């Protein structure tokens, strides 16, 4: 397994697919990286030379990925919560942030149902 940005990427897959195992790199970014590095999209990771891996690492070093990206996202959410914006309040309450209906659905964000017992009559 080759290590890129602190992540072991699978050897048997194509380079484009393997790069998506790094947090912050999707298909489009992966394709841009290998084009800039001058590597064929059909190349498998096991066929890469150390020179090609080095070029990929140099390009990825210029992109914010893994820990830095996760830290930035969490700081952005924390900032929204501190300034008291509507989005920050939704994050704090564990509700959907982007305007989705939460009366019936939103179970992923709200968690399992907490049933309330009926009063005795």
Swiss-Prot record:
This is Small ribosomal subunit protein uS13. Keywords: Ribonucleoprotein, Ribosomal protein, RNA-binding, rRNA-binding, tRNA-binding. Gene3D superfamilies: 1.10.8.50, 30s ribosomal protein s13, domain 2. HAMAP family: Ribosomal_uS13 (MF_01315). GO terms for cellular component: cytosol; small ribosomal subunit. Residues 91-121 are annotated as: Disordered. Part of the 30S ribosomal subunit. Forms a loose heterodimer with protein S19. Forms two bridges to the 50S subunit in the 70S ribosome. SUPFAM superfamilies: S13-like H2TH domain. Belongs to the universal ribosomal protein uS13 family. The keyword GTP-binding does not apply. The keyword Transcription does not apply. GO terms for biological process: translation. It holds the Pfam family Ribosomal_S13. Located at the top of the head of the 30S subunit, it contacts several helices of the 16S rRNA. In the 70S ribosome it contacts the 23S rRNA (bridge B1a) and protein L5 of the 50S subunit (bridge B1b), connecting the 2 subunits; these bridges are implicated in subunit movement. Contacts the tRNAs in the A and P-sites. One of its GO terms (molecular function) is tRNA binding. InterPro entries: Rbsml_uS13_C (IPR027437), Ribosomal_uS13 (IPR001892), Ribosomal_uS13-like_H2TH (IPR010979), Ribosomal_uS13_bac-type (IPR019980), Ribosomal_uS13_CS (IPR018269). Residues 106-121 have a biased composition (Basic residues).
